[in-house]
C-alpha cells in the first residue's frame, strides 16, 4: 500500500470545436496484479465549502482503460531506439474513458491497460494505492507510449454532467 499525490493536468483546447482535450500518450498495465486507487481527500459532492466559507468546485479524475489484444504482438521502439515486441498490446479501438469523483475508488484488473491517473480541477488529489509488487520491473509494470496520443474530450467541468469521450 502506498500514497500517491496526483496534481491537476492541463487540458488542450481545440478552438474550432470549443472543447477541452486530454491527450493520452502512455498506457500501462500490471500483468499479474490488480491496482486500486482510493481518493482520500475528495468529496463526493460536485461543490464543497472551503476553509474560508467559499464554495469551490471539487476536482474529478479520469479513468481511461483498454483491454488487451490477446494472442497478438506489436513491434515498437524504445526511447533509445531499440526494437521491442509487446505481447498482448492494448486494443486502442476499444479504449474507454470515464469520469470518477470523490466517493468512488477504481480497481484496474490484472493486465488491464490504463492511463496514469488524470486529475482535472484546481487542486491535487491524494490516493491510497493498493497493489502487490514483487520488484521485477517487467512483471510489476509494462508501458506503451504513443507519439501523437489519443484525444479524450472532457466537457462539463465542474458540473454533475462532466463527461469524457473519445
Task: Name what the model sees in each region.
Residues 112-144:
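A short beta-strand-loop micro-motif that forms or neighbors metal/cofactor-
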Residues 59-61, 96, 104, 123-126:
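A short pocket-lining beta-strand/turn micro-motif at the edge of beta-sheets
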Residues 144-152:
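Short, Lys/Arg-rich amphipathic alpha-helical interaction segments
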Residues 99-116:
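Conserved metal-binding segment of the jelly-roll/cupin
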Residues 132-134, 152-157:
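Glycine-rich loops and low-complexity Gly/Arg-rich segments
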Residues 1-97, 136-139, 145, 157-166:
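Non-catalytic, conserved peripheral segments adjacent to functional cores
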